């Protein structure tokens, strides 16, 4: 059978270009979708992680990742934003956790990443940030030298 027949019979559900699921899109984990649609190494960071940690209080509508390309993707009712990060920074594992196959930045790595993209970014609750760890990550990853 061809893919279109599987779709017509309800066996496969189209998710994104060349990506299909055996369950309806609404039943999927949005972080898994975000990881899959980019087809390259990526990790969840910046606004998504900072909002979850209570560091920023504004509503976040996109799942924010970094990758080696910049891209915006919508799948179902979810939106994904991929910010481009140089490979030398992207592939540095400091402050990146593997949570069930999805790479997620720690709060401190997300702050360091945000400062890389926007050095003047305002954090609503900065007292919840360990800035010593942030500075260490910035030094180790190389961010401190990137924007000098």
Regions found by a protein language model. Give the residues of each.
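Basic amphipathic alpha-helical segments that dock to polyanions
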Residues: 3-14
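Glycine-rich beta-strand-to-loop/alpha-helix junction loops that act as flexible
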Residues: 16-19
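Nucleic-acid-binding surface
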Residues: 21-148
